[in-house]
Swiss-Prot record, chains A, B:
Name by which UniProt lists this protein: Phosphoribosyl-AMP cyclohydrolase
Binding-site residues, Zn(2+): 85, 101, 108
NCBIfam families for this protein: PRK00051.1
Keywords associated with the record: Amino-acid biosynthesis, Cytoplasm, Histidine biosynthesis, Hydrolase, Magnesium, Metal-binding, Zinc
A cellular-component GO term for this protein: cytoplasm
Gene: hisI
Native organism: Chlorobaculum parvum (strain DSM 263 / NCIMB 8327) (Chlorobium vibrioforme subsp. thiosulfatophilum)
């Protein structure tokens, strides 16, 4: 077993950030196991998540730290953080307040396909994005 | 709701591959909800997955198509494929034969930290990698 696959190194030393300094974080409801979203973290947002126990990401579109729920109020309380064998993907077990998805659904994975062509909605709408984020001008 | 967030376009048209032509795929046990791994797909591996209903990825380390389980026998039968709001992450619901992780665990996420420093093993060893893949020379 290589050094990156065991538990000898510290957690932060084990995380492998990519060439942009980011690592993907899968977010899962800690009680139901439902996968809610995937987002990206840099070292700063990971440290903030560990410190505050609230999920904090790096927004690639806005190029800034993103405390999940800072606009919508839909914060994520972090219960556990897991890391994969290669150290290059994280899994957060959270309690999600409201919906995780900016479109208004509970999960960002609100569409599924079985035939590879058609898609259908497979999740519950939790809020109206225009009410939460304001109307787009 | 933008075009990329609804169900009007076809599934394959909705998938947004990154600048390497890849999209991350989260893999979840379809019965227990346990997150097993994350891997990457290109268009070819996604089409093969849809066609065969067996998970097929793009191996970034070997730079080739990777039918999951082709070496270990630990195939993944694909029940559903979901796509997130931005179209840039997939979620596969699968039946996993044996362990998903090449280290021998059921899930690649076999280590967790709660304090951000120490890590502990939180999963079950399913097989001995040396027996399955052969000894490393």
């Amino acid at each position: 077993m290589s050094e990156n696959q065991d538990t000898q190194k510290s957690f932060l030393e084990t995380v492998k950030f990519d060439d942009r300094g980011l690592v993907p974080a899968i977010v899962q409801d800690h009680e139901t196991g439902k996968v809610l979203m995937m987002a990206w973290m840099n070292l700063e947002s990971l440290k903030m998540t560990l410190e505050k126990k609230k999920a904090c990401y790096w927004s690639r579109s806005r190029n800034k730290l993103w405390l999940k729920g800072e606009s919508s109020g839909n914060m994520q309380d972090v219960h556990d953080i897991m890391i994969d064998c290669d150290g290059d993907t994280l899994l957060l077990k959270v309690s999600q307040k409201g919906g995780a998805c900016h479109v208004g659904y509970h999960s960002c994975f609100y569409r599924k396909t079985t035939d590879g062509e058609q898609m259908e909605i497979c999740d519950t709408l939790m809020f109206d994005p225009e009410e939460v984020y304001g109307k787009k001008s």
